[in-house]
Amino acid sequence: MSILLPNMAEFDTISELEEEEEEEAATSSSSPSSSSSVSGPDDDEEDEEEEEEEEEEEEEEEEEEEEEAPPPPRVVSEEHLRRYAPDPVLVRGAGHITVFGLSNKFDTEFPSVLTGKVAPEEFKTSIGRVNACLKKALPVNVKWLLCGCLCCCCTLGCSLWPVICLNKRTRRSIQKLIEWENNRLYHKLALHWKLTKRKCETSNMMEYVILIEFLPKYPIFRPD
């Protein structure tokens, strides 16, 4: 018994030491949790303040962009501008020969509506070029038309095809000439020439006329 007592005392001291170590570990583990629980609300408040500041900065940037953005330009439709444009001018054929609606001469009289828009000399020069093209092409078309009519019964109408093709080529030549005149002068003066079909004044038949349209002027200096 005298031998066992010292050993039991040793075991008691060892168990006490282990219990003390466990208590120290528990206290050390609880201290960070308490500190974290204490520091948690402070961190949340700081995060909320940062988010509010960022949102305020974004709102200020959006307001600045809205203030700096110019107002959208007001679009004026072309139909609205054409509605208030003057009526187009018709230049009808004045020749004594007409082949498939195309006369051999256009009227060279200067329309009074074009006063102040284009010089009379320029108008007569342009009409003179068109008449020169017709004077060169129409006599050949008339000859082929007469031959086609004479042989129409024998060829079942096929003899009229040459004069139809020649008349189509003459129209294309005049259209190219008018387009050249537009690019040279008339588009700069807000005018547009074109060859188109219209009814005759004395009958229901169709004829080719030169239509002079007034191009709309866009109000670029008009305030919004």
Swiss-Prot record:
It comes from the Eukaryota. Residues 1-80 are annotated as: Disordered. Residues 13-25, 41-69 have a biased composition (Acidic residues). Pfam families: Erf4 (PF10256). Residues 26-40 have a biased composition (Low complexity). Palmitoylated. This is Cysteine-rich hydrophobic domain-containing protein 1. It comes from Homo sapiens.
